[in-house]
Amino acid sequence: MNNSQLSKLISLTKPLVSREVNEIHEINQENSPDVGDIPSIKEFKELIELSEEIYVFKDKDKIIGFILLMREGSSYKSENYKFISSQYDRFFYVDRIAIQSNYRRRGLAETIYKKAINDAKRLGLDLLCEVNTRPRNDISLAFHSKMGFREIGTQDFTKNSVVYLCKR
């Protein structure tokens, strides 16, 4: 199945219905630790409420991939978000992106990212994110390099290390 056979990429309107939250949460947990683990559905719903944009891919009516984007000025407590906020006044921050395992390697993440990049450009914003370097996420590092992201900083935490990336 290729992208043209999937429902097109759409932006969800908040508040999300329970089914949407549950489907996105399930994909998030399947992709942990590459994306942050959030076991509590309540905490995950709170994260969704803090996000500025949520783009999803669907296969028929089921969500199979997503990206959560934050803007500046959020009350989000993430150390990575705080670092980005300390460096940039206006931005789109990719908090997480994940694709359901049996839909990977089909260009969905690239399509979602292209939409985020185009929307950021349209708004005059940089698109920012972080990728784990400990544990090392080589697939994500290669992907972001291919998409034209450049390094803007690094940070070491107790459990992991990250590189911060920017796409202008």
Task: Write out the residue ranges for each language-model feature.
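A short helix-loop-beta-strand connector motif used in the catalytic cores of GNAT acetyltransferases and
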Residues: E46-V56, G65, M70-E72, Y93
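A short beta-loop-alpha structural element at the N-terminal edge
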Residues: N3-E26
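A short, internal acetyl-CoA/4′-phosphopantetheine-binding micro-motif in the GNAT/acyltransferase core
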Residues: S85, D95-R104, T133-R134
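Conserved active-site alpha-helix within GNAT-family acetyltransferase domains
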Residues: T133-G153
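Conserved GNAT acetyl-CoA-binding A-motif
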Residues: A120-T133
